[in-house]
A protein has these predicted regions:
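RNase H-like DDE/DDD metal-dependent nuclease/strand-transfer catalytic core used by mobile genetic elements
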Residues: 104-135
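A conserved active-site cap/scaffold subdomain adjacent to cofactor or substrate pockets
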Residues: 153-169
Length: 191
């Protein structure tokens, strides 16, 4: 609930608590209680052998020394499906520089699945992997106008290939058997 509404609600109960005070409480809790938890999960995330990463634009109003129309970025890093509990962490940055990924992933060594953003190439010690959903979109964009049903087109074949992989993944996810075993069995023959 927004702080201005909380301020109003508290006032109705006879407690005059300013938005500034409420915001300071949130900041204090985040710094003293949530930051250590975040740091713990960050260290655990970096121990994994496969991560996924993405960054998306966000607009932050009233950010010091920046125009309200400025674009900032929220970075997301997630553990892969490795049978361990999933870890998902977000990180804010005023820029999209690949240096942000370098800083966040410092100490990580393994596979990193991302979109085509070249900034991830700055991260040392990783092996870049592409996301099949993004690859499928690139194939769709490569299909010439009016040729989406022309199965001799390489881009149409690429879309079909991705769709087949997605169907395999979907059937795997519905199976009660060991995920790792089934995935290796089904996808190795196809890939």
């Amino acid at each position: 609930m927004p702080l201005y509404r909380q301020e109003k609600d508290w006032k109705q109960y006879g407690a005059e608590i300013s938005r500034t005070t409420l915001a300071n409480w949130i900041i204090y809790c985040a710094q003293h209680y949530f930051q250590p938890v975040y740091d713990y999960f960050h260290r655990e995330l970096l121990k994994r052998s496969f991560l996924m990463g993405d960054e998306t634009r966000v607009q932050v109003l009233n950010e010091p020394e920046r125009r309200p129309q400025s674009q900032s970025f929220m970075w997301l890093f997630r553990s892969g499906e490795d049978g361990l509990p999933v870890i998902i962490l977000y990180g804010y940055s005023p820029t999209r520089s690949g240096d942000n990924a370098v800083k966040f992933l410092d100490g990580f060594s393994g596979y990193l699945e991302t979109d085509g953003y070249q900034g991830y190439n700055k991260v040392p010690g990783i092996k870049r992997c592409s996301c099949w959903a993004h690859i499928r979109r690139y194939f769709i964009d490569a299909i010439p106008k009016g040729k989406q049903f022309d199965y001799s087109q390489p881009a149409v074949q690429g879309v079909q290939y991705c769709d087949r992989l997605f169907r395999i993944e979907d059937s795997i996810n519905k199976q009660p058997v060991s995920y790792t075993h089934l995935r290796a069995h089904e996808t190795d023959s196809y890939l």
